[in-house]
């Protein structure tokens, strides 16, 4: 018997057949989309993929590999002089009989790399490795040929008499974008990853392929007697094209994207998890009731569990496998492929036959926008479809997409702005601190939102307002609350905005693009124009309130974070344009005015010489020069998360959970270790303990905050937790303040020092 897996026990034939079943599912669901992406005859493409699947794990016949499984399932090991120190995927291509399989010489490299790298290892193929593999082929693998034929029943003819390591020469240089068969390679190798991962997880590779989100969205419109707006009709008419769509807040961009997606597999991205969660709820259960969507970000499991979604673990696993029909995701989960990390082809091949929606592109840093633009270029070249939706589109990004050939006959671009004027803007020649009394007075009769640029500034403003009048309904929200408290506060601000409450909320730009809230008045520190206009969108959102007097106040003096968070030159240029618009036109700013100003301030002419421009161009240069497979998946993901951060529990919170969650986690570690030491292992009990440990770790993570590592480096405020499995969680030696007051959460969160003054 030749084994492939130990838990659950699975023979090589069973595992390979499971892959072939997923291949058929993929072909039936999206075969027509996949077939047009390569220059091969469609039947030949599927034949090659079937060959790769059949051969991918033949190297597992290697005796030491079989012994690893035999030991785990309680079977006697086979005598062998070899160690299990050569990966099975490096052996599998040895069996391919190219002549019998009628594989052209120029496709050998594609086939060998698709099989040989279906598990990615950071291994250099040198002469020592080649010699070692040849010895294994001669002294071990050749003796297994009959077993493969009799036990595995190979579907295709294999090499039997002489197994040579010559195929390794096809693995020495990775296939690059400029190579002739690059597209074919991406599709074959990428889909091999997908098929293998789904079969190994015993999950279907594609789910609910017939559930059309466009139909669900139009049904929602019909049931509520809504007509399709012009923007939605535009998307419907251009379903077969790529789209760049500029539309103001409240135009129905989400529904527009869903109508464009229609019956295609799709991925919908947004900058922040909280906004993705809200959108996922709207589409899954609140409005559209499309219950076939996945949610994919670093805390999606917690969110689905906390919000009582059934089968939440299955849903997250399916999203990670990219199996869901529609997936709501942060870009770090699905947009790593421009780094061409080891294994990037899985992501790239999947996006190639899907539609991808990028919402609010202007909300990302210039470096991340460079990654998105590089990714859009790659998707365009391979034949995939994208939609960029944004309220404001910096001209520098459009120009770069034009340079990269993305603006072609298959691209539709339109701007849809509402004629409703929602904001009467006053630029104050003072600091926010100088106008706190007016803010308090407004808070006694209106919903007032105060947005500042840093956590430190938010906390200071909160304290000062509290000292002026402790009776006003005063609330604080920023990123330095532990996860579970931040979720509660985010829910509180959403509820506050919905009901008849009056009072004041002080926040950072956390609220800009993430929370769907509507206030009467906005007071904000100056920032870049795109950021300011995002903030405007949290005031008089629907344009139903009178704006005879100013409802937006911008404070241009002593604003925090200028030069550290926001580029000083871009802030000043934007402020200059805004003041010209107010003085020469009107303080009642239209949506067209906003778009025009952002395009001007982010034109290449204006940006040259700024740090923003330098970061954007440098990032593109690095991406363009990258060689395939230099980075690992984790390294690519870390770059996309924009910042290296420490996940830490504030010391006071840690002291409260030290003898509960932390102790329980330690106890579970010990129980699992003991179970591994037993001769008669109870696999079910071990599985239960591991599941419980994972659950406890999720509870511990809810007690953490994320702090940029560079902010706390060398300050001595971070301490390790010396427990196996919790090494990546730290203790933060700062106070934590939050208490419940008459059913409301009150407090500053992590009480930070001057060293974190510019933290957002």
Functional labels for PLM-detected ranges:
Residues 2, 536, 542-760:
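C-terminal accessory region of SF2 helicases/translocases
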Residues 2-212:
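Accessory nucleic-acid engagement/destabilization modules that flank
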Residues 83-86, 480-483, 487, 501-549, ...:
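Conserved RecA-like helicase motor core of SF1/SF2 enzymes
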Residues 239-260:
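Walker A/P-loop
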Residues 265-287, 297-300, 395-397:
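Conserved Walker A/P-loop ATP-binding site and its immediately adjacent core
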Residues 265-276, 443-466, 476:
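Conserved strand-helix element at the start of the C-terminal RecA-like helicase core
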Residues 346-355, 361-415:
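Post-DEXD/H (motif II) to motif III coupling segment of the RecA-like Helicase ATP-binding lobe
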Residues 395-443:
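Interdomain hinge/linker at the junction between the two RecA-like core domains of SF2 helicases
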């Amino acid at each position: 018997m030749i084994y492939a897996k130990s838990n659950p026990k699975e023979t090589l034939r069973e595992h390979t057949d499971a892959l072939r079943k997923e291949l058929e599912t993929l072909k039936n669901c999206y075969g027509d989309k996949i077939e047009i992406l390569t220059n091969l005859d469609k039947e030949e493409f599927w034949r090659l993929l079937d060959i790769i699947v059949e051969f991918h794990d033949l190297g597992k016949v290697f005796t030491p590999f079989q012994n690893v499984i035999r030991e785990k399932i309680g079977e006697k090991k086979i005598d062998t002089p070899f160690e299990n120190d050569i990966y099975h995927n490096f052996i599998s291509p040895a069996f391919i009989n190219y002549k019998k399989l009628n594989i052209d010489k120029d496709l050998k490299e594609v086939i060998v790399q698709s099989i040989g790298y279906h598990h990615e290892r950071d291994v250099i193929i040198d002469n020592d490795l080649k010699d070692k593999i040849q010895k294994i082929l001669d002294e071990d693998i050749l003796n297994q040929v009959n077993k493969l034929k009799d036990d595995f029943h190979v579907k295709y003819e294999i090499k039997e008499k002489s197994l040579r390591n010559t195929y390794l020469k096809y693995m020495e240089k990775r296939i690059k974008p400029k190579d002739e068969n690059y597209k074919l390679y991406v599709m074959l190798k990428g889909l091999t990853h997908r098929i293998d991962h789904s079969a190994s997880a015993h999950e279907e590779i594609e789910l609910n392929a017939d559930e059309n989100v466009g139909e669900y969205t139009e049904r929602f419109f019909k049931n509520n007697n809504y007509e399709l707006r012009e923007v939605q009709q535009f998307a419907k008419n251009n379903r077969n094209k790529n789209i760049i769509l500029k539309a103001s807040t409240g135009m129905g961009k989400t529904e527009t994207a869903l109508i464009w997606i229609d019956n295609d597999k799709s991925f919908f991205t947004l900058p922040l998890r909280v906004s993705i969660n809200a959108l996922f709820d709207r589409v899954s259960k609140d409005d559209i009731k499309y219950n076939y969507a996945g949610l994919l970000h670093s805390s999606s499991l917690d969110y689905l569990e906390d919000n009582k979604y059934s089968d939440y673990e299955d849903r997250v696993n399916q999203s990670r496998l990219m199996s869901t029909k529609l997936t709501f995701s942060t870009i770090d989960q699905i947009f790593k492929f421009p780094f061409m990390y080891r294994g990037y082809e899985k992501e790239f091949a999947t996006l190639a036959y899907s539609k991808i929606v990028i919402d609010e592109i202007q909300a990302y840093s210039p470096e991340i926008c460079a990654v998105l633009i590089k990714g859009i270029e790659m998707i365009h070249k391979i034949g995939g479809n994208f939609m960029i939706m944004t309220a404001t589109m910096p001209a520098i990004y459009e120009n770069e997409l034009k340079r990269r050939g993305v603006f072609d006959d298959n691209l539709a671009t339109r701007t849809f702005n509402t004629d409703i004027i929602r904001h009467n803007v006053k630029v104050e020649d003072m600091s926010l601190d100088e106008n706190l009394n007016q803010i308090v007075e407004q808070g006694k009769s209106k919903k007032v939102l105060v947005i500042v640029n840093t956590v430190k500034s938010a906390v200071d403003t909160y304290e000062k307002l509290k000292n002026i009048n402790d009776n006003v309904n005063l609330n604080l929200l920023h990123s330095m609350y532990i996860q579970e408290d931040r979720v509660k506060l985010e829910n509180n601000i959403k509820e506050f905005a919905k009901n008849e409450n009056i009072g004041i909320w002080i926040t950072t730009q956390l609220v800009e693009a993430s929370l769907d809230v509507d206030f009467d008045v906005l007071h904000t520190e100056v920032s870049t124009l795109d950021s300011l206009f995002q903030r405007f969108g949290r005031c008089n959102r629907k344009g139903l309130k009178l704006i005879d007097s100013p409802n937006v106040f911008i404070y241009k003096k002593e604003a925090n974070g200028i030069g550290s968070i926001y580029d000083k030159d871009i802030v000043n240029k934007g402020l200059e344009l805004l003041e010209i618009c107010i003085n020469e036109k009107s303080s009642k700013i239209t949506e067209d005015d906003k778009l025009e100003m952002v395009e001007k301030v982010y034109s290449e002419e204006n940006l040259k010489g700024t740090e923003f421009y330098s970061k954007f161009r440098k990032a593109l240069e690095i991406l363009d020069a990258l060689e395939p497979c230099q980075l690992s998946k984790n390294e690519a993901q870390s770059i996309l998360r924009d910042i290296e951060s420490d996940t830490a529990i504030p010391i006071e919170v840690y002291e409260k959970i030290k003898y509960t969650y932390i102790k329980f986690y330690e106890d579970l570690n010990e129980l699992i270790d003991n179970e591994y030491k037993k001769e008669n292992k109870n696999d079910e009990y071990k599985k239960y303990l591991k599941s419980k440990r994972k659950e406890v770790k999720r509870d511990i993570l809810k007690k953490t905050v994320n702090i940029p590592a560079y902010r706390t480096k060398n300050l001595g405020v971070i301490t390790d937790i010396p427990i196996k499995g919790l090494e990546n969680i730290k203790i933060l030696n700062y106070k934590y303040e939050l208490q419940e007051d008459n059913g409301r959460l009150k407090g500053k969160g992590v009480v930070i020092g001057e060293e974190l003054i510019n933290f957002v």
